[in-house]
Amino acid sequence: MKQTLTLAILFVCTILWTHPSAAQALAVGIPADVHGQGYVYGYAFGDDGEKQALDICRGVNLPSGVVMPENASQAQKLCAIVGDFTNQCFAIAVDVPNLVPGAHGVGWAIAADSRTAESQALAGCEAMAGPGRRAACAVRKSVCDGSAK
């Protein structure tokens, strides 16, 4: 039986500076079978950042040019806000290049600086990927908000 595997990576940054002190929000959807069902995430700035991050993660009201892969529905159902933050950084690490099917490991983190966020995201990816795929984990996205570096 041939199984088609697709990794759903969705990353969109929607910037709405309606209030300079508004938090950034990160939403993630990672099913137990990330290898077969992929994963999704979204983040946004602004007063309604949580709603926007969830919408992006779920594939709702996507900005022009962003396409959600067909088999992302299970990951989308699991989308949840994992953090609101100001003057911090977040990172996503995966064991395959962006838009390539078949991830075994995905990690994410929010921290005071990019180095810490990236280190924690890599550790999460390596733990999920297991011994055979740990070395393939790499930070695929790292973003800082406000004064964080």
Regions found by a protein language model. Name each.
Residues 13, 18-20:
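N-terminal signal peptide c-region/cleavage motif recognized by signal peptidases
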